[in-house]
Structure formats: structure tokens, C-alpha cells
Design a protein with these regions (language model features):
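Conserved alpha-helical substructure of the radical SAM core
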Residues: 1-99, 103-110, 114-115
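Short acidic, glycine/proline-rich loop/turn micro-motifs
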Residues: 31-34, 131-135, 200-205
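Amphipathic alpha-helical segments in well-structured domains
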Residues: 40-44, 76, 143-146, 214, ...
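Radical SAM enzyme [4Fe-4S]-AdoMet core and its adjacent flexible, acidic
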Residues: 137-144, 151, 155-246
Length: 246
């Protein structure tokens, strides 16, 4: 029995945000072709055809960016329909997407719910921490719009988790972030260490996460997570859960 896991970037490096720490923006700026545009339907159809020929147990199809929703909802409707049509081996299909949340409305949320997408939505914590770095093209903070998108998904019963980039500000505000996530009922969380630009001095940005700060974050947040878990109030923290499952 064979399982296949796909990671598809339907909008290449395109994004409707200008996050200060964006690794992809730094990486794409150094490529000969920074952006390949929106994936064609012919290409996504061919990718799914080959993947589903190989899969007869499970096939996980995940979409990432840049910002994948820039490909448009019709693109995703087409992709899901193609996957179901080409699933001649009757593999179990799983769909996932990682998004900044700005495009999410009732139509998107209904689509995610209908097709059982797992949605990873980027939220860096409290408004103060989030809006320091996660800004749009007009350099305005996006906290309110992201929280609103999450509320829309909750109304539609969409499965989602929270993706948080760990920066210097995260370490300073980890208790406030933890309390905010707990208050909002965000029980499934992934924390991703921030990376400095490839060709710049490490630790030179106002958001830079040094090894020492990352160590401090891990110790502080693990103690808090463990204390609550032992009290019967465990939240899913991907990094810690993975370590304990090793």
C-alpha cells in the first residue's frame, strides 16, 4: 500500500502581505525567476494524475505559498474535483492549506468545510505582537482581519490550527500569547522559528530569533504547557507533542 504526500504552491511566491520576516520573500528575491505566476489548470491536473496513479492507500494534498488563496477559489474547486475524479485507486484523500487568512470569507469557509480541509492560519499572537511584523501591502496590521477569518471558519465548522512564527517579541510576550490563545479556544498550535535573511548577519533584525532566545522560549513555554497538561488542560503544541512521541 502506497501513500503520497504533495505540497503544491499554486501561486508561486505571490503574497498579499508584506511580513517583515518573510523567508520566502527573501528567498524568491534571489532566484533567477522570482515568481512563476498562478499554476495552470493543465499543470495541476497533470500533477494530480501522476500522484493518484501512485497512491492506493492515502494521498495528502497540501497547498502553500506565498499565499495559495491568490490562485482563486475556482482554482481550488477545480483541483479538488480533479483529485476526486482521478482517484481511481480509491485512496483516502486529505486536503490541507496554509494561509494568512486575508481572503477567507463565507464562500471559502464553506468550501473548506465541505471538502474537509485542514486549514493552518497564520496568527502571531496578540494584536501587539502580530501587527509588529504581519502587515499588508499598505503596511497596515492584519490582526483584526485574521481573527475575523478564524471566526468565519469556526461558524462553518472548519478544522484549523494556528501557525505562529517565533520572533524576539514572541519570547518577550509568550505568557500573553498563551493566555490569548487559550481565551480564544485555539487548542491546536504550531510554532515556527523565525529565520534571518540568508545573506545577512544573524541576529541583526529587530525581530531576529537568536539561538539563546529560542532556548529561552522553549524552556519557558514548555514549563507552562507541561504545568497545564498535568492539570488536565492540555493544548496541542506540535513541537512539544512531537518530542514526547519520539
Amino acid at each position: 500500500m502506497r501513500s503520497v504526500h504533495l505540497l503544491i504552491k499554486p501561486a508561486s511566491g505571490m503574497c498579499n502581505m508584506r511580513c517583515q520576516y518573510c523567508f520566502y520573500a527573501d528567498e524568491t528575491s534571489k532566484r533567477e525567476t522570482p515568481n512563476y505566476g498562478i499554476m495552470s489548470r493543465q499543470t495541476i491536473s497533470a500533477v494530480l494524475e501522476h500522484a493518484l496513479e501512485a497512491a492506493d492507500a492515502e494521498c495528502t494534498i497540501a497547498f502553500q505559498g506565498g499565499e495559495p488563496t491568490l490562485a482563486g477559489l475556482d482554482f481550488f474547486r477545480f483541483a479538488v474535483a480533479e483529485a476526486k475524479e482521478k482517484n481511481r485507486n480509491y485512496a483516502r484523500l486529505h486536503f490541507a492549506i496554509q494561509t494568512n487568512g486575508l481572503a477567507i470569507d463565507d464562500d471559502w469557509a464553506a468550501f473548506f468545510a465541505e471538502n474537509h480541509f485542514l486549514v493552518g492560519v497564520s496568527l502571531d499572537g496578540t494584536k501587539e505582537v502580530h501587527d509588529c511584523n504581519r502587515i499588508d501591502a499598505a503596511r497596515k496590521g492584519t490582526f483584526g482581519r485574521v481573527v475575523h477569518a478564524i471566526e468565519i471558519m469556526e461558524r462553518h465548522g472548519v478544522d484549523y490550527n494556528i501557525l505562529t512564527v517565533i520572533t524576539k517579541n514572541t519570547v518577550r510576550s509568550y505568557r500573553a500569547i498563551h493566555s490569548f490563545f487559550k481565551k480564544k479556544g485555539f487548542r491546536y498550535q504550531q510554532f515556527i522559528p523565525c529565520l534571518d535573511p540568508l545573506e545577512e548577519e544573524r541576529g541583526g533584525k529587530n525581530w531576529s530569533l537568536t539561538p539563546e532566545l529560542f532556548e529561552k522560549y522553549l524552556k519557558q513555554s514548555f514549563d507552562l504547557w507541561y504545568e497545564e497538561a498535568m492539570a488536565g488542560d492540555k493544548q496541542y503544541h506540535r513541537y512539544f507533542d512531537n518530542l514526547l512521541c519520539m
